[in-house]
Structures are given as structure tokens and as C-alpha cells.
């Protein structure tokens, strides 16, 4: 049961960072190298409590679908997306946001179990955990770049 923890500091208001983190459109941009598309549920705009999104993407040369649901929501402090169906045995991804001086700090906690028992544990050790960490880091770097520029206006309503 690996747990990935990340912390990212962003020079932008907490409300903006929170909303960018739940933007389906920004997520699509951050995962474009995996040809990730929102194919069902909320497919654009901002996702909210009890809403789902189904993503279609290619990871490890396999095209796959994953459906997640927002299972906790406290704007602008926290939201959780949890897997409903997909390649993992389960996952919960908690996103925490707090103001620290002039910065907003995102704290991600990605808690998951791979399928296939011991084989899944070996895959985690060899490549899955590092792949997931890299994806989350890339996504947060994009959120940071967009939140700290005027680009955020493309993703959030005025």
C-alpha cells in the first residue's frame, strides 16, 4: 500500500490554486503526453462533490479507463478523488491547500493499492510508484506555472 506525498508552493491565491487543481481542462493539458481524455461524467470545467469523471489514457503502452469520484470537498482547503473503477485495486487522492505567507501550499497524498497481489507490489517497487510520482509532480508544476501567470483565466470563470 504505497503512499505518495508531495508538497508544492505556489505564488497565487488559495482559491485560484484550489479551483485549478479541480479543473478537468487543466488536467487534460497536464496529461497530454499520455493522450488522456475525459470521456464520461464531467468532461470539462470544474468538478464538484459527488461528481465523477472517466479518463481514458495510455500508460505502459496499454489504453485504459479510470473513473474517479469527488468524495470529500471543502473549498478552498481540501478535496479527495477516489477511484470507482480502473486499473488500481483502489486509490484515494487527497489534495490539501493552505495559505503560508504569500504562498499557497498544495499537499498531495496519493494512497493506493495495485492489483495482482505480490506481482502488483513488485511492479510498484520497479516502476509504478515512480511513474505516479512523476505524473503528480508534472501536474503540480503546470498548476504552479498557470496559477502564477495570467494563463489561469483560460481555465477558470471570471
Q: Where is each model-derived feature located?
A:
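Hydrophobic ligand-binding cavity/cleft-lining segments
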Residues: 1-44, 48
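Short, surface-exposed coil-to-beta transition loops
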Residues: 3-5, 63-67, 90-93
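Generic structural detector for well-ordered beta-strands
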Residues: 5-11, 56, 69, 96-98, ...
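Beta-strand elements of well-folded, non-transmembrane domains
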Residues: 10-12, 59-61, 72, 87, ...
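A short, structured loop/turn motif at beta-sheet edges
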Residues: 14-15, 72-76, 96-105
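Alpha-helical coiled-coil heptad-repeat segments used for dimerization/assembly
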Residues: 22, 134, 138-141
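Glycine-rich portal/gate segments that line the openings of hydrophobic small-molecule binding cavities
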Residues: 38-85, 105, 138-157
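Beta-strand/loop substructures that line and gate deep hydrophobic ligand-binding cavities in soluble
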Residues: 82-134
Amino acid at each position: 500500500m504505497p503512499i505518495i506525498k508531495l508538497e508544492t508552493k505556489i505564488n497565487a491565491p488559495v482559491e485560484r490554486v484550489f479551483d485549478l487543481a479541480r479543473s478537468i481542462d487543466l488536467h487534460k493539458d497536464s496529461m497530454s503526453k499520455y493522450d488522456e481524455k475525459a470521456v464520461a461524467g464531467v468532461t470539462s470545467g470544474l468538478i464538484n462533490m459527488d461528481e465523477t469523471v472517466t479518463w481514458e489514457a495510455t500508460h505502459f503502452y496499454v489504453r485504459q479507463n479510470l473513473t474517479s469520484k469527488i468524495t470529500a470537498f471543502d473549498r478552498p482547503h481540501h478535496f479527495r478523488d477516489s477511484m470507482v473503477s480502473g486499473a488500481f485495486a483502489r486509490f484515494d487522492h487527497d489534495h490539501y491547500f493552505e495559505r503560508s505567507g504569500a504562498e499557497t501550499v498544495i499537499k498531495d497524498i496519493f494512497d493506493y493499492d495495485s492489483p495482482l497481489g505480490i506481482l502488483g507490489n513488485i511492479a510498484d517497487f520497479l516502476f509504478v510508484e515512480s511513474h505516479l510520482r512523476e505524473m503528480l509532480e508534472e501536474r503540480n508544476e503546470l498548476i504552479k506555472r498557470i496559477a502564477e501567470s495570467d494563463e489561469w483565466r483560460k481555465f477558470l470563470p471570471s
